[in-house]
């Protein structure tokens, strides 16, 4: 019998809690990630008031310097720790795949200076369309169409760009390049980025509409991902008949592998929380696992190095945390964590190699305190033990520490 009938894992994308032991091997604009500290620096420079996460024990997590504006709790309502990454990457897919039990020893490729000419030329030859070279770099998806959409409308060229993650994105105005044509181009791009030197996690079709100054991306986005290289705990749950629910970009990250119910993309963190709450309320969801990603912290504020915006985004989540808890059942378990860091006060614009926080809460808890410090995959090992399935490659369960 399961200790918890339902477990809900919420990933606050990029909310790291201090430099990892191997941060000296990861860099931002030539600066090692050794002094990165997403939560610590936001608390220090912008102020951080997250009373609901503090109540669970966020401020009790072991750190060299306590979080400046997040108090410790003498009697927290949950259990907390921080977790270390073992995989050789600090991107979204690597973090999520490791959380679900995989050790990624061959990291995906990222392209901070844009994609090499060889790839661009192949896409041009296949599509019969030129590529706007100036867009070929890490770019905000809305900014890139604002900057190059007018030119695309005039010339029919492709907008090819990337991000901090191992992705190749192609934006196209639906009136200029039909969606089906864009999909064919993306399928081709997927076929040429499955091995080094361009091993990419996802190719993303990004259609948009509108006029210069008023472009909007449409719901016709399509992701061409790769599945995890071996079964994760998601697969083991699904194979055992345990329902799995994906909220936000989780389904894309795992290419649908091990997901039995995709609840759709999030338009924003707030929309994602709404979707999670609707998922919690589903009458058929009496047992199983929900997995939510809230990406605004990372996409809107971490990469843009905006500590005040990041702080406000954390406040928004914390304000809504009681709503999530109110829709849980007594024998539910809530796990709140991250997938990497993205210190908005740091050099560069890339993710940062950090520990991730872990907060565990259940109305059924009679105890509280610290979980032994471990690794990302301990989360999936705990989920696996609870539902009576095998772990994946790595991970040690902390289920026995939750009283």
From Swiss-Prot:
Keywords: Cytoplasm, Isomerase, Manganese, Metal-binding. Disulfide bonds: none annotated. It catalyses: 2-deoxy-alpha-D-ribose 1-phosphate = 2-deoxy-D-ribose 5-phosphate; alpha-D-ribose 1-phosphate = D-ribose 5-phosphate. Gene3D superfamilies: Alkaline Phosphatase, subunit A, Phosphopentomutase. GO terms for cellular component: cytosol. Pathway: Carbohydrate degradation; 2-deoxy-D-ribose 1-phosphate degradation; D-glyceraldehyde 3-phosphate and acetaldehyde from 2-deoxy-alpha-D-ribose 1-phosphate: step 1/2. It is an enzyme of class 5 (isomerase). Mn(2+) 1 binds at residues 13, 339-340. Its EC number is 5.4.2.7. Mn(2+) 2 binds at residues 298, 303, 351. Belongs to the phosphopentomutase family. Isomerase that catalyzes the conversion of deoxy-ribose 1-phosphate (dRib-1-P) and ribose 1-phosphate (Rib-1-P) to deoxy-ribose 5-phosphate (dRib-5-P) and ribose 5-phosphate (Rib-5-P), respectively. HAMAP family: Phosphopentomut. This is Phosphopentomutase. It comes from Streptococcus pyogenes serotype M2 (strain MGAS10270).
